[in-house]
Regions:
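Conserved mid-domain beta->alpha element of the FAD-binding
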Residues: 5-21, 133-134, 247-326, 330
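Glycine-rich FAD pyrophosphate-binding loop
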Residues: 20-41
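Conserved N-terminal glycine-rich FAD pyrophosphate-binding loop of Rossmann-like flavoproteins
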Residues: 35-53
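Conserved N-terminal helical subregion
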Residues: 48-162, 367-383, 403-404
Length: 405
């Protein structure tokens, strides 16, 4: 099979190497618009469930990712200097460029051709192939030009900026700071021994009130460094652009009624996005391409394979999309919860995946005192982009039981 992958992110690279592992005779080319060694963003976060999938699919690249990943432990919620530590949280962060390098090297070792600096504006630019896999992100040109996928895009109301810093956060940290214009907070986690991802978020009203809409980008970074001075310990905030700046954005939630048309198929952010506050983007993109590769192997006809892939992945996305929507809404309504005591606020932050939160007064959502019948159902199974509730001991890849969260 001749395959063109548009986009050299984790989804495109992993799909290509999986196809080569299944059938070395496949002719697979990745077209990546950026130069080799350049990427957007800083690092990505993930948990054992993704690492288990990687080990099951390709142990060699999984070991490299495992070895390169930064392991953070615990979760810290810091509201104006008052901290609540959740000791049941742990996960992984990895430098995005390091992740791409591992996957690109593995794909090329297997015979995949990667063409950098090759922007594909429309499928008609591509050579004649049997399958075009659109892994070109939320702004997918392939999705726009290839057919009617019935795409829907919803713009979140909060503003956010994706930054990096030399401060290494050993725990996944949510610092909340109050300003005269409202609350500003961050999602911070280590990605290697020298740096962390630091995503800043606030309401549009706070963003405008603080002047981010008019001040030069470098002045904006300086203001953020001042606001988070206590958490950064003197370290700078750095943007993704060569000049060190980065754009403020509104998150775009993308859904598609159809994931394929003819020989064109969507995967990763081109097919769907889930709000960054649940930290599932990379996991879901990898899940897409694992399913796509499996269906292409198991079905003799392309249309049957793509139909089965679409059905499986749309069903798999229902729960994380719901959790992401609720998580985004929780942060968009931060004023509803922020005046609670820090431990109460932290409890609801970790339980924000509950559909009850928007509809009941916050005090009714909190766990009942001991002896009063146990905890409220809204907080029995915390779900967040940084934590989940502790479960029973389960076997790991090494065969040693440990708690998952």
């Amino acid at each position: 099979m001749r395959v063109a992958c548009v986009g050299g992110g984790p989804a495109g690279l992993y799909f290509a190497l999986l196809m080569k592992l299944r059938e070395p005779g496949h002719d697979i080319t990745i077209f990546e618009r950026k130069a080799a060694g350049s990427t957007d963003g800083w690092g990505v976060v993930f948990w054992d469930d993704l690492l288990d999938k990687l080990y099951s699919s390709d142990p060699r690249s999984a070991r490299e990712i495992d070895q390169a990943a930064f392991r953070w432990v615990n979760q810290v919620v810091d509201v104006q200097g008052k901290q609540v530590v959740h000791a049941n949280g742990r996960g992984y962060g990895i430098n995005r460029q390091r992740l791409l390098d591992i996957l690109a090297d593995r794909a090329q070792d297997l015979g995949v051709q990667i063409k950098f600096d090759q922007e594909v504006m429309a499928p008609s630019q591509l050579p004649e192939v049997d399958l075009i896999v659109a892994c070109d992100g939320v702004n997918s040109r392939t999705r726009l030009e290839a057919g009617s996928f019935q795409t829907d895009m919803h713009l979140g109301s909060n503003k956010y900026i994706w930054l990096g810093t030399g401060k290494v956060f050993e725990s996944f940290t949510f610092p909340f700071v109050h300003t005269d214009s409202g609350w500003v907070w961050a999602h911070a986690y280590g990605i290697d021994a020298e740096s962390s991802t630091f995503i800043v978020e606030c309401s549009s009203e706070t963003w405008t009130g603080l002047g981010f809409d008019t001040m030069p980008p470098q002045d904006g970074l300086s203001l953020l460094e001042k606001l988070f001075e206590r958490h950064l310990d003197g370290h700078q905030l750095i943007g993704q652009f060569p000049d060190g700046n980065a754009p403020w954005l509104n998150f775009r939630t993308v859904t598609n009624q159809h994931w394929y048309e003819g020989k064109n198929v969507l995967a990763g952010d081109a097919a769907h996005t889930t709000h960054f506050t649940i930290g599932s983007g990379t996991k879901l993109a990898i899940g897409d391409v694992i399913a796509l590769a499996e269906n292409l192997q198991h079905h003799g006809k392309l249309e049957l394979a793509l139909e089965s892939y679409e059905r499986q992945r749309q069903a798999a996305l229902l729960q994380p999309q719901s959790e992401a929507r609720l998580s985004a809404q929780w942060f968009e309504n931060i004023s509803r919860y922020i005046d609670l005591k820090p431990h109460q606020f932290s409890t609801l932050l970790h339980g924000r995946g509950s559909p009850l939160l928007p509809h009941l007064p916050p005090p009714r959502l909190l766990p009942a005192p001991p002896g009063n019948g146990g905890s409220h159902p809204a907080t029995q199974t915390p779900q967040t982009g940084g934590t989940e509730g502790e479960s029973d001991l389960q076997p790991t890849r090494a065969g040693v039981s440990r708690r998952r969260f």
